[in-house]
From Swiss-Prot:
GO terms for cellular component: endoplasmic reticulum membrane; nuclear membrane. The active site is at H403. The keyword Magnesium does not apply. This is Protein adenylyltransferase fic-1. The fido domain mediates the adenylyltransferase activity. It comes from the Eukaryota. One of its GO terms (molecular function) is hydrolase activity. The gene is fic-1. It comes from Caenorhabditis briggsae.
């Protein structure tokens, strides 16, 4: 009998048999039969679901709120090796240590932000603007280019090439109109052209943006007395024309010119505010009540309201015995200005905050107080002793600055200006719509602290208004000198009689 030799494969099979995991079939064969477990009933499942829902709705939220409150009020501890993910305030340049809560707030989402310590904390500086970085870089590049252009213009100015200097500075002013260095160089070029008023304005504007600029202070001290003398001479010229106007013969030609000025004033004062009616259309509305096709009802009502306000000024305010101006006078003018366009807000001080471009007037709770201060200033003895042109211009500016109404502030301010001027013997001042940009620019300069440009603007157009009357009287007809007067048309006579009748009834 042969005996088979044991091989390595037999050993491997033996080990595999010993280490093999029992299969499910082997377990079933060896283990006794177990009873099958029965499932839960439907009633039990429903009851458990209701209990879980009630717990989630009533117990879980207060528990999480309490936990969040504990985390919020927990003491803070320093973690030298960590940095805050959000840094709301200015970045500290002294200490690199950051603060983190002692108990971390639990989160149910994976934070996708990789939190790495910022290595530039010691060299950081606060960012003082909210402009986009691209815009800041663009503005910085413009200012840099403007300064280089100003240096080139300065070299041309010293070499005597003023034309080239002016051309370069116009480019620099277009790039950085508010830069003090640019304004100072532009002022020096204006001064060399003997444009002292414009040069002084450049120095004043430079000081508004940089009050401590020594070069601007020295240059302003040189031009200020010269410009003051120019302003006094200009005001004296206007007063001399006013005296000449006062001695004009009250003829039919003068009355006709007054009627034309009336229509011109209504047209220009509403056109400055954006009204698109032409002078002929404005006149047609006032004379015949015609409705202009293609124009809004509001534009018609603005013209009618200004007509009512002018009649109130001519027939009531100018006939008052005392020359004091009250808050009620201003409110009554405004009530007529907006009486047809916006009767709800007409004659009422605003109760909401308004915004005029980049300018923000006073809050509504201070409007009445500011308006009372303005009226007290108007009626003060020292103010009454001022030049009427200066007083009227400053009163206009103060009313616009307070901005007491939601709409119609500019029209009411121009009525107040003319009320003061006409009480001093001046004819109505027309501020043309063609000079709208100059009008608002001079008011902007007044916001920077210099009222003289706006006073000059009012004086210039007051002189133009008087010259219009004098020129009309001199060129209308030679019959006025001989005592003969041209006859009015039937329509002109009818309108003049209507205005005079209304004035007598109002007084």
């Amino acid at each position: 009998m042969s005996v088979r030799r044991r091989t390595h494969s037999d050993d491997f099979s033996f080990r595999l048999e010993r280490t093999r995991r029992p299969s499910k079939l082997d377990v079933l064969r060896e283990s006794p039969t177990l009873p099958v477990q029965q499932g839960y009933s439907l009633t039990t499942v429903v009851l458990v679901s209701l209990v879980v829902t009630l717990v989630c709705q009533n117990v879980a939220p207060p528990a999480f709120s309490y936990l969040n409150q504990l985390i919020k009020n927990s003491p803070k501890r320093k973690i030298p090796g960590q940095s805050n993910r959000l840094n709301i305030g200015f970045i500290s340049t002294n200490s690199p240590e950051k603060f983190a809560p002692a108990v971390q707030k639990p989160t149910f989402l994976v934070d996708p932000i990789y939190d790495e310590k910022w290595k530039g904390v010691h060299t950081a500086v606060p960012v003082m603007t909210t402009e986009p970085e691209e815009k800041r870089d663009n503005n910085h590049a413009k200012v840099k280019e403007a300064i280089l252009a100003a240096k080139a213009a300065s070299r041309s100015r010293r070499d005597g090439n003023l034309e080239r200097a002016v051309t370069i500075m116009e480019h620099a002013m277009a790039l950085a109109p508010n830069n003090p260095q640019i304004l100072i160089e532009m002022g020096q070029i204006r001064e060399m052209h003997n444009e002292l008023v414009e040069a002084d304005q450049c120095y004043v504007k430079a000081l508004a943006y940089d009050p401590g600029n020594s070069e601007a202070l020295v240059l302003r001290a040189r031009t200020n007395p010269l410009v003051s003398a120019i302003d006094r001479k200009m005001l004296k010229t206007v007063h001399d024309l006013r005296n000449e106007f006062a001695h004009l013969q009250h003829s039919t030609a003068l009355r006709r010119m007054m009627r034309e000025t009336y229509f011109l004033y209504v047209y220009h004062t509403v056109a400055i505010e954006g009204n698109t009616l032409s002078l002929g259309q404005t006149r047609a509305i006032l004379e015949s009540g015609m409705v202009i096709p293609g124009k809004s009802i509001r534009e018609h009502n603005e013209v009618i309201g200004m007509d009512a306000a002018l009649r109130f000024l001519n027939c009531s305010l100018l006939s008052k015995e005392h020359h004091e101006i009250s808050i009620d006078d201003i409110l009554e003018m405004h009530r007529r200005v907006l009486g047809n366009a916006d009767p709800v807000e007409a004659g009422k001080i605003r109760t909401t905050q308004v915004y005029v471009g980049k300018f923000t007037p006073v809050a509504p709770e201070y409007v009445l107080e500011q308006l009372a201060d303005m009226v007290d200033w108007l009626n003060d003895e020292s103010t009454m002793a001022m030049d009427p042109i200066e007083r009227a211009a400053i009163a206009h500016y103060k009313l616009v600055l307070v901005h007491p109404f939601t709409d119609g502030n500019g029209r009411t301010a121009r009525l107040l200006l003319n009320l003061i001027m006409m009480r001093s013997g001046f004819p109505p001042v027309i501020l043309p719509v063609e000079t709208r940009a100059e009008y608002y620019a001079s008011l902007h300069v007044a916001n920077l602290g210099d009222l003289r440009p706006f006073v000059r603007y009012v004086a210039k157009h007051s002189e133009a208004s008087i010259q219009r009357y004098i020129g009309a009287m001199k060129t209308s007809s030679g019959n006025v000198i001989n005592g003969e007067e041209p006859n009015l048309t039937a329509e002109e006579s009818k309108v003049s009689e209507k205005i005079e009748t209304e004035c007598r009834a109002g007084s």
